[in-house]
Protein backbone atom coordinates (compact mmCIF):
# COMPACT_ATOMS: atom_id res chain seq x y z
CA UNK A 1 0.00 0.00 0.00
CA UNK A 2 1.23 3.46 -0.88
CA UNK A 3 -0.35 6.72 0.28
CA UNK A 4 -0.51 9.27 -2.54
CA UNK A 5 -2.42 12.13 -0.89
CA UNK A 6 -2.63 13.46 2.67
CA UNK A 7 -4.63 16.11 4.52
CA UNK A 8 -5.26 17.15 8.11
CA UNK A 9 -7.91 18.35 10.50
CA UNK A 10 -7.29 19.43 14.09
CA UNK A 11 -7.00 15.88 15.42
CA UNK A 12 -6.14 13.57 12.51
CA UNK A 13 -3.97 12.99 9.50
CA UNK A 14 -5.80 11.43 6.58
CA UNK A 15 -4.34 9.52 3.69
CA UNK A 16 -5.60 8.17 0.39
CA UNK A 17 -3.88 5.26 -1.33
CA UNK A 18 -3.55 4.47 -5.03
CA UNK A 19 -6.88 2.60 -5.09
CA UNK A 20 -8.78 5.52 -3.52
CA UNK A 21 -9.07 3.91 -0.06
CA UNK A 22 -9.00 6.53 2.70
CA UNK A 23 -7.34 6.10 6.09
CA UNK A 24 -6.85 8.23 9.18
CA UNK A 25 -4.61 8.31 12.23
CA UNK A 26 -4.76 10.37 15.39
CA UNK A 27 -2.24 13.18 15.58
CA UNK A 28 -1.68 12.21 19.22
CA UNK A 29 0.72 9.59 17.81
CA UNK A 30 2.69 12.42 16.12
CA UNK A 31 3.07 15.34 18.56
CA UNK A 32 5.33 17.35 16.23
CA UNK A 33 2.70 17.25 13.49
CA UNK A 34 -0.07 17.93 15.98
CA UNK A 35 1.59 21.19 17.03
CA UNK A 36 2.82 22.14 13.55
CA UNK A 37 1.44 25.02 11.51
CA UNK A 38 -0.37 24.39 8.23
CA UNK A 39 2.75 25.56 6.39
CA UNK A 40 4.97 23.11 8.30
CA UNK A 41 2.51 20.26 7.69
CA UNK A 42 2.47 21.06 3.97
CA UNK A 43 6.26 20.77 3.69
CA UNK A 44 6.63 16.98 3.28
CA UNK A 45 8.00 14.49 0.81
CA UNK A 46 6.87 11.02 -0.12
CA UNK A 47 9.54 8.34 0.12
CA UNK A 48 9.59 4.67 -0.73
CA UNK A 49 8.08 3.61 2.58
CA UNK A 50 6.41 6.69 3.96
CA UNK A 51 6.08 10.41 4.39
CA UNK A 52 8.84 12.66 5.75
CA UNK A 53 8.73 16.16 7.24
CA UNK A 54 12.36 17.25 7.25
CA UNK A 55 11.86 20.52 9.17
CA UNK A 56 9.86 18.70 11.86
CA UNK A 57 12.05 15.58 11.88
CA UNK A 58 8.91 13.45 11.65
CA UNK A 59 8.16 10.33 9.63
CA UNK A 60 5.02 8.29 9.08
CA UNK A 61 5.20 4.94 7.35
CA UNK A 62 2.59 4.05 4.74
CA UNK A 63 2.07 0.81 6.63
CA UNK A 64 0.99 2.67 9.79
CA UNK A 65 -2.16 3.90 8.05
CA UNK A 66 -3.39 0.31 8.10
CA UNK A 67 -2.77 -0.29 11.81
CA UNK A 68 -5.76 -1.35 13.89
CA UNK A 69 -5.01 1.28 16.54
CA UNK A 70 -5.33 4.46 14.48
CA UNK A 71 -7.02 5.97 17.53
CA UNK A 72 -5.37 5.77 20.97
CA UNK A 73 -7.22 3.91 23.69
CA UNK A 74 -8.54 5.97 26.61
CA UNK A 75 -5.47 5.03 28.67
CA UNK A 76 -3.08 5.94 25.84
CA UNK A 77 -4.95 9.20 25.20
CA UNK A 78 -4.60 10.13 28.89
CA UNK A 79 -0.82 9.75 28.92
CA UNK A 80 -0.34 11.22 25.43
CA UNK A 81 -2.25 14.37 26.41
CA UNK A 82 -0.77 14.69 29.91
CA UNK A 83 2.95 14.90 29.24
CA UNK A 84 3.36 16.49 32.67
CA UNK A 85 3.02 13.04 34.23
CA UNK A 86 6.37 11.34 34.62
CA UNK A 87 5.73 7.87 33.20
CA UNK A 88 8.70 6.29 34.96
CA UNK A 89 7.59 7.59 38.37
CA UNK A 90 3.96 6.67 37.71
CA UNK A 91 5.03 3.12 36.82
CA UNK A 92 7.26 2.89 39.90
CA UNK A 93 4.42 4.01 42.14
CA UNK A 94 2.26 1.06 41.05
CA UNK A 95 5.12 -1.45 40.90
CA UNK A 96 5.22 -1.67 37.12
CA UNK A 97 8.20 -1.69 34.80
CA UNK A 98 8.43 1.77 33.19
CA UNK A 99 9.40 0.33 29.80
CA UNK A 100 6.32 -1.87 29.85
CA UNK A 101 4.08 1.11 30.61
CA UNK A 102 5.71 3.08 27.78
CA UNK A 103 5.04 0.14 25.47
CA UNK A 104 1.38 0.22 26.51
CA UNK A 105 1.18 3.99 25.94
CA UNK A 106 2.87 3.83 22.52
CA UNK A 107 0.84 0.87 21.33
CA UNK A 108 3.67 -1.65 21.08
CA UNK A 109 1.96 -3.88 23.66
CA UNK A 110 -1.62 -4.15 24.85
CA UNK A 111 -2.37 -4.39 28.58
CA UNK A 112 -4.79 -6.96 29.89
CA UNK A 113 -8.15 -5.65 31.09
CA UNK A 114 -6.98 -6.18 34.67
CA UNK A 115 -3.74 -4.24 34.11
CA UNK A 116 -5.58 -1.42 32.38
CA UNK A 117 -7.98 -1.23 35.34
CA UNK A 118 -5.02 -1.11 37.75
CA UNK A 119 -3.58 1.84 35.81
CA UNK A 120 -6.96 3.59 35.72
CA UNK A 121 -7.48 3.08 39.45
CA UNK A 122 -4.09 4.65 40.17
CA UNK A 123 -4.92 7.63 37.93
CA UNK A 124 -8.19 8.09 39.84
CA UNK A 125 -6.34 7.82 43.15
CA UNK A 126 -3.90 10.53 42.04
CA UNK A 127 -6.79 12.70 40.93
CA UNK A 128 -8.49 12.32 44.29
CA UNK A 129 -5.27 13.30 46.08
CA UNK A 130 -5.08 16.43 43.92
CA UNK A 131 -8.71 17.32 44.64
CA UNK A 132 -8.03 17.08 48.37
CA UNK A 133 -5.04 19.45 48.31
CA UNK A 134 -5.57 22.62 50.29
CA UNK A 135 -3.33 25.59 50.88
Question: Each predicted region: which residue ranges?
Answer:
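Motif-centric detector for short Cys/His coordination patterns
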Residues: 1-135
